[in-house]
């Protein structure tokens, strides 16, 4: 009964959103789309949505933040909805899981937290980490190869999965910086001692 029957996606509703909010939420959109695309639950039905959302973010987020023009705000509004359609069916990953736990503990902005985490999560996933749980069931790890798909679409170096992983992680980091986000937790007001004090618990909760 909580699920709406209609969603109104009207870019006029977001034209006055401050640039900082556009940056934070836009990077959240990018995280939604990226995690949906490399998810083990991804499918032919979600992949196209996720890739299109990523493309729209890289083409329009910076202008949406700095210029707040109708075209870029419309495209980012569409990207947000498209990414939502993707992750509602493919689910998300460890970046979002950690962002929720970090936000609850340190009261950080959700989208900004994802922006900071995402480059490191991309690099981690690119190492083909060992599976430590029984679900989801899969026989073939593919995140690194799917990052290569993303890098290829964006025109980034992608001759190998390893090269693509690093190129995409760097591109995400640089996009965040261009949008005015300080891409570290110290700038978000998290004390190093407090971070170390809670990091093990947060990692457990995120997992």
Show where each model-derived region lies.
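Gly/Pro-rich interdomain helix-loop hinge
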Residues: 112-194
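Glycine-rich phosphate/pyrophosphate-binding beta-alpha loops
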Residues: 81-114
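Short, amphipathic C-terminal "tail helix"
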Residues: 192-207
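Metallocofactor- and cofactor-centric catalytic cores in central/energy metabolism, strongly enriched
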Residues: 60, 174, 178, 203
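Flexible, glycine/charged-enriched surface loops at secondary-structure junctions
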Residues: 40-49, 64-75, 90-95, 133, ...
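C-terminal and late-domain segments of enzyme folds
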Residues: 20-82, 86
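A glycine/threonine-rich phosphate-anchoring loop and its flanking beta-alpha core
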Residues: 1-42, 128, 142-149
